[in-house]
């Protein structure tokens, strides 16, 4: 499958760089375009940061936030194609070291190669068949220590979640409820306690989990198509929480 990503070195991995910063800090980023075509860089819900980067060129930006948040950085050129094939990740703003990150995506396998070849796709006919968290699906996602939540009863755990795909998802927790600390789509929902979180396209949450009991509990997309890979179950957006 054709895939791009923002990486921290010249070695390609299919997991976008996870950027974390404290509230009030200034983040200085240098973004280098190692591709053969022009790309862009922007951070959602900010102004004045959008840039175009020619092949072999680079840009530098400074970003800060005075509030907790899960910001999406992405390539806005030829949107949504470049972001869809992988160029979209999370900037987590907060002050909790016990934090986890879920960058959720969906793909229609044949479309990735079609976009790579410069062909047009009709997004009204989009029907994804592969689903990932941080570039992995079940069972491999449980090996990602930045995604798989582990902890103890009474811990304060933050989960930064962003939907950087092109389909809506509904992430459901078994065993626990989470409090909403940040919602890009519905800021009025901050403070609510829920076990299911609808995530619109290119929107995000920060969730706070304080486990009240030990156990291993699943988290998955309530749209069960997203718990498959190539039509096979159980793959896709499914992982477990492990609380002691």
What are these regions (language model features)?
Residues 150, 157-171:
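Long, repeat-rich segments with strong aromatic
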Residues 105, 162, 172-174, 222:
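Generic beta-strand/beta-sheet core signal
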Residues 1-39, 45-48, 60, 93-94, ...:
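N-terminal, post-signal-peptide metal-ligating segments of extracellular/periplasmic oxidoreductases
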Residues 108-111, 165-167, 177-178:
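Short, catalytically relevant binding-site loops at active-site mouths
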Residues 179-197:
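Intrinsic, low-complexity N-terminal interaction/targeting segments
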Residues 36-40, 45-100, 108-110, 196-244:
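Extracellular/periplasmic metallocenter environments
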Residues 29-31, 75, 160, 171:
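Hydrophobic beta-strand segments within beta-rich accessory/binding domains
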């Amino acid at each position: 499958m054709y895939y791009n990503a923002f990486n921290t070195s010249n070695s390609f991995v299919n997991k976008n760089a996870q950027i974390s910063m404290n509230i009030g800090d200034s983040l200085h980023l240098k973004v280098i375009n190692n591709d053969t075509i022009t790309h862009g860089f922007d951070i959602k819900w900010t102004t004045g940061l959008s840039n175009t980067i020619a092949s072999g060129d680079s840009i530098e930006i400074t970003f800060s936030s005075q509030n907790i948040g899960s910001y999406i950085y992405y390539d806005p050129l030829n949107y949504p194609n470049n972001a869809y094939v992988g160029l979209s990740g999370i900037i987590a703003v907060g002050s909790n070291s016990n934090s986890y990150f879920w960058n959720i995506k969906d793909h229609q396998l044949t479309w990735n190669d079609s976009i790579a070849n410069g062909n047009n796709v009709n997004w009204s006919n989009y029907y994804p068949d592969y689903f990932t968290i941080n570039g992995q699906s079940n069972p491999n996602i449980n090996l990602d220590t930045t995604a798989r939540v582990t902890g103890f009863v009474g811990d304060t755990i933050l989960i930064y979640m962003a939907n950087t795909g092109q389909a809506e998802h509904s992430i459901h927790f078994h065993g626990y409820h989470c409090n909403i600390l940040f919602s890009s789509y519905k800021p009025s929902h901050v403070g609510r306690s829920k076990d299911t979180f609808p995530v619109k396209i290119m929107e995000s949450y920060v969730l706070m989990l304080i486990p009240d009991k030990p156990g291993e509990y699943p988290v998955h997309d309530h749209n069960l198509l997203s718990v498959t890979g190539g039509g096979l179950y159980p793959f896709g957006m499914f992982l477990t929480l492990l609380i002691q």
